[in-house]
Amino acid sequence: MSVAFASARPRGKGEVTQQTIQKMLDENHHLIQCIMDYQSKGKTAECTQYQQILHRNLVYLATIADSNQNMQSLLPAPPTQNMNLGPGGMSQTGPSQTLHSQGNLSEALGSSLPPSSIMQGQISNGPNHVSMQQSGQTTLPTTTMSMAVSTHGSAPGYSHTVPSSQNVPMQNQGSIGNYVSRANMNMPSNPVTMMHQQATSSHYTSAQAGSQHYQGQPSIAMMNQSSQGSSMMGQRPLGPYRPSQQGSSQQYLGQEEYYSEQYGHSQGSSEAMTPQYYTDAGHGDYSYQQSSYGEQSYERTFEDSSQHYYEGGNAQYSQQQTGYQQGSGQQQAYSQQQYSNQQNYPGQQQGYVPAQGASSQYSGYQQGQGQQYASYRTSQTTSTAQQQRPYGYEQGQYGNYQQ
């Protein structure tokens, strides 16, 4: 294998041509295919050997690109930099190619290229380690990044939200604080869209001074400017976003207290109502949000309220909520609809933030939902029917309300 690598390696800079580079790219393509095959068979030793060869090839290609700036004229049109040779030149064969080529580069080329993603083969459950784009590099297009992220199939609802959120206009940045505080129950999905938006646009990437997913989280703080191994997009969301996030959790608690006063729920039951709604939005999605935010206070607020309700001893409700979590297909469909519809918010945002009528209407709907939950608590025999009914009504309400 070392001999094959040496033979593919040009002897001098003068001999480096497009054919030579293409040959090495083909070799890398073959290596990636072999790595994927061995991973599917569970042969980790062979995977490691091929990954080392692939790593050396990529390092060599990066060295060529750095040492000879004129090499861009010799390279194929799409991959003008070595990093683009990974996702741009080999993206057709599967997600692991991009992940392997990017992951190997992340060790040796942190200063020159935008490395992204730890090798997914080594971390099969680690799609959250998504590209950390450095501030100096803008060669990696957002479409390529969207490809890299959307191929992470093991993050529920994740591949759905990334493409849709890329279309969100930039104007959300200014009004995100007001929108988050007024969106009430809409907030959990909306910050995800915001973080995706920040991650997928260079404008927001430059704004994320101290962070990086949403996803890290995808996210999607996807592109971390400090090339740290923060998982998913915004392991630490940007400064102005962080207070609004904390404010949103306080807003939720305030809403819960408001619900408890309206409907005579105890604080535990009102908290349980809100986690149930979030769970409908998808613990699959929201668990991803938690890891993307990496914000202990917000995470803990959500988890504590949920656990507090579980500890309340309502076993039937806990089972029902577990059923929702297990119905990942329904969750993802609902989350996808919610996120895709939220693309309409940015255009309506400036009119929506001052529009107390719309917010009041939505709050009123949530109060009605609270009544349904209250009736569910009192008549446990029809829990399944009443549990499903507000959920189905939420989908219809979201479709009409957001469009």
UniProtKB/Swiss-Prot annotation:
The keyword Repeat applies. GO terms for biological process: chromatin organization; positive regulation of dendrite morphogenesis; positive regulation of transcription by RNA polymerase II. A motif (SH2-binding) lies at residues 50-53, 360-363, 398-401. InterPro entries: SS18_N. Its main location: nucleus. Residues 92-105, 161-171, 263-277 have a biased composition (Polar residues). GO terms for molecular function: transcription coactivator activity. Keywords: Activator, Calcium, Chromatin regulator, Nucleus, Repeat, Transcription, Transcription regulation. Residues 341-403 are annotated as: Necessary for nuclear localization. Residues 72-111, 152-171, 224-303, 318-403 are annotated as: Disordered. It is found in: Nucleus. Coiled coil: none annotated. Transcriptional activator which may be required for calcium-dependent dendritic growth and branching in cortical neurons. The MFD (multi-functional domain) domain is involved in transcription transactivation, nuclear body targeting and dimerization. Belongs to the SS18 family. This is Calcium-responsive transactivator. It comes from Xenopus laevis (African clawed frog).
